[in-house]
Amino acid sequence: RDLVRSRGLGDVYKRQERVKSGQLMATLHGDIRVLLSGERVALNYLQRMSGIASYTRQIADLLAGSKTKLLDTRKTTPNMRVFEKYAVKVGGGYNHRYNLSDGILLKDNHIGAAGSVRKAVEMAKEYAPFVRKIEVEVEDLDMVKEAVEAGADIIMLDNMTPEIMKEAIRIIDGKAETECSGNVTRENVERLV
């Protein structure tokens, strides 16, 4: 807090502007003791968030011109979610869910407890009939078919090969939004579009 209240922070770049290695990003003015006491923490945050934003931008640029959006995960570093999610947005990505209350995501443990994809979707619709979209994480084409038939709003294709994903998207045929998750990297993302 003292660092922020210090006598001056002069930005020399704009948010989302690309910064080159060695480029001056900001100037600070104030009590040297206050500045030095917060320097390392500020640098750590700046480096981490810049890294997230930069990596996100690299992948978002690969998706430019397609209908595909790059979404983040809810799995963030403890106490850093707001910063990390903001860094994703600055980098050109989109936030998926901020927390568990932002949507219903049925995973393998929910499906196992319910007995089937269909039953899990039915139970979720009973629990929250109008307030949330229901997303189902599926691992194979049988689960895809069941999720479509059950009326899932979003179907997440988890750890599938690009070939199986294409078949899954053919089965879904626009009846639900589609996400892919797991093993998506800068090196393979263009094959998934």
Task: Please tell me what each predicted stretch does.
Residues 182-193:
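C-terminal non-catalytic interaction appendages of large macromolecular assemblies
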Residues 157-158, 178-184:
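Glycine-rich beta-strand-to-loop/alpha-helix junction loops that act as flexible
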Residues 1, 7-137, 142-150, 154, ...:
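Acidic/glycine-rich phosphate/pyrophosphate-binding loops and surrounding catalytic core
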